[in-house]
Amino acid sequence: MARVKRGVIARARHKKVLKAAKGYYGARSRVYRVAFQAVIKAGQYAYRDRRQRKRQFRQLWIARINAAARQNGLSYSKFINGLKKVSVEIDRKILADIAVFDKVAFAALVEKAKSAL
């Protein structure tokens, strides 16, 4: 059986990892062994943080809605409850956007929610 030399495959694999580690600090971008570990860890962080991003944005939207609702004399939970009672189906992302950029419209929503309570 013929001998298989794997230099080409190894070189390609190393190049792939070092390309992914481009921009990393020090040995992490130059030494294959260290770069491989850094790339694996980066992938784990990316996977985790894609899920956390959704939670963090929802937290941000809720904090903004709560702050705006309290300026209009209503807590977040009562505001959301009031909106559900008058069947206003606007998600938290849009509510937060309205709270930041259109205070008059948000105040109208708060009044609508107050009327249902």
From Swiss-Prot:
Record-linked CDD domains? Ribosomal_L20
Taxonomy, superkingdom: Bacteria
MF terms in GO = rRNA binding; structural constituent of ribosome
An example GO BP is:
ribosomal large subunit assembly
Q: Which InterPro entries match?
A: Ribosomal_bL20, RIBOSOMAL_L20_CS, Ribosomal_protein_bL20_C
* Keywords carried by this UniProt record: Ribonucleoprotein, Ribosomal protein, RNA-binding, rRNA-binding
One GO cellular component term, please give it.
ribosome
**Mind telling me which Pfam families this protein's record contains?**
Ribosomal_L20
Family membership, please give it: Belongs to the bacterial ribosomal protein bL20 family.
The UniProt entry, under HAMAP family, shows:
Ribosomal_bL20
Function text: Binds directly to 23S ribosomal RNA and is necessary for the in vitro assembly process of the 50S ribosomal subunit. It is not involved in the protein synthesizing functions of that subunit.
Protein name listed in UniProt: Large ribosomal subunit protein bL20
| Protein species of origin | Actinobacillus pleuropneumoniae serotype 7 (strain AP76)
